[in-house]
Amino acid sequence: MFFHAHPDDEALLTAGTMAMLAAEGHRVVLVVATAGERGLADVEPGEELARTRTAELYKSAAALGCARVVLLGYGDSGLSSDGGVAGDRPDNAFIDADSEEAAGRLAKVLIEEEADLLTIYDPAGGYGHPDHVQVHRVGGRAAEIAGTPVVLEATVNRDPLLKGLRLAGRFYRFPAEFDVRAFERAYTPGDAITHRVNVRRFARQKRASMEAHATQAAGGEGPRTLAVMLKVPGPLYRLLFGTEWYVRRDLPAGARLTHPFDHWPRS
């Protein structure tokens, strides 16, 4: 089971792993906390955007081979300009949900599915979105309630990301509000990552998942991350996006495993 905050998060962080596990015959279930109705898009925020992004989510899930999609129905908490919690969030915002109640709802799905693996996010929620931090809290507690044996924190290797951003900064002028230094605290350093999953064989499915989220490739005054990713040509796409990273907290940081179900130590 893959637990995400908004539609399109699965495409960016775990799509290759999902497609790989589905191809191996596993039942893959995608659970999403919100419909992403407050995300930046050309569609007006609110119910119309929620409907559109939900349709995009199902299209993405189909491309990845998911057997089931579950929407928990919480409101998108939004993101303030300084990267914190938005002040005008809805009454049912995911960030304001009772963590134990939300964990119970997720645990019910885990038990229904007899899930043997759950993915969440790292404690910082990757880049710090409040809903992503809540996914970490709620998902971790749900796994405890359900007795799910394997919990993986989906993340990004911070080390090459920082190198790439600093190199890009020599040739490209980032917007004034973009602070490369913020990524010094985002995601996870390489020496703490336990799983490096090679998903290059599933680049086609991962790209199709990204393409499904058309609203997230537009909107705003500058280029969107998803739009930039989709412009990368095939061979380079497989190189840049062909690895997905995870942390399993009950394993040593130097485990360096290559499949979600790998054991440590290896037999």
Which functions belong to the PLM regions below?
Residues 1, 92, 96-267:
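Metal-dependent de-N-acetylase/amidase catalytic core
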Residues 1-114, 141, 145, 247-250:
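Active-site rim/loop-helix segments in enzyme catalytic domains that contact anionic ligands
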